[in-house]
Curated annotation (Swiss-Prot):
Transmembrane segments: none
Annotated catalysed reactions: uridine(55) in tRNA = pseudouridine(55) in tRNA
InterPro entries assigned to the protein according to its UniProt record, in alphabetical order: PsdUridine_synth_cat_dom_sf, PsdUridine_synth_N, tRNA_psdUridine_synth_TruB
Gene: truB
The organism's taxonomic lineage, starting at the top: Bacteria, Bacillati, Cyanobacteriota, Cyanophyceae, Synechococcales
Protein name in the entry: tRNA pseudouridine synthase B
Native source organism of the sequence: Prochlorococcus marinus (strain MIT 9312)
Amino acid sequence: MENKDGFLVINKDKGCTSHDCVKQIRKLLNTRKVGHTGTLDPEVIGTLPIAIGSATRFIQYLPQGKTYIGQIKLGIRTNTDDIHGEIINQKCWPKISDEKLDQYLNKFRGLIKQIPPKVSSVHVNGERAYKKSFNNENFELAPREVKIDELILMKWDQINGIIELKINCSAGTYIRAIARDLGEILNSEGCLLQLKRISACGFHEKNSIKISDIKKGIDQKNASNFIIPTISALNHISTLILNKEEDINFWQTGRAIKFDINYFNEGNNFDNKKPIKVVDKRKMLLGIGFLNKELTNINPKLVLNAK
């Protein structure tokens, strides 16, 4: 396969780790330069964007929002905050209407503080929390601020104590923590029953593909059709077009470009804190830059094909 730069949107199966997916893609495409955009727990299914080749350098510039559909089981608390952990407490759940339950969900909308599950990849004194947990070490995790942009009650099964939610949230949000904390707020217990990620970093499940289908594509010589060009993943970023060879040469040798609003696509917003994608007149991606504080120059931050 000739073009190995861009993003593959994997539809991850249950039981497979994010790193397992990366290893399989490395082997299939015969390249070491592969990385995922954010870990999915093994039991979580759905959208896992994977960067290939030079696209790995652009992961930090992707949109950070993620959307999940999950089910929470009330009445059960586990040591992992999901149904697969060891049960540490059980408690009846309340009889409650959809309307009242939705009012409780207001506590999780907007900017909130949450304590990550102890079985998580959060670092504690240089070590992953899950390792400390498996070694039965005593430790505490500090609350972290996350943002829940959208929290929709999809279904409430009173008989079985199962809540189905759609959650649009910032990177770093733990849905398991929401399950645990919602159980406490309802004077019960709660754990995550199942979870599917339907979008991440600007990629949606409708564009995702099973790894088994990639294998078939390689056999049929059309696997490159599955790769999304890096520039297509950066549509949310303002675009600077360099038409002059002199400017392109300046850029590729790491020198600043004089800011000219005429170089920008119409309607673009810009300031010195937002990244700018730089392209040539053929719309080929050249890299990422930032305006200086004086708004006079665009300084290279990431340069493709540097000289």
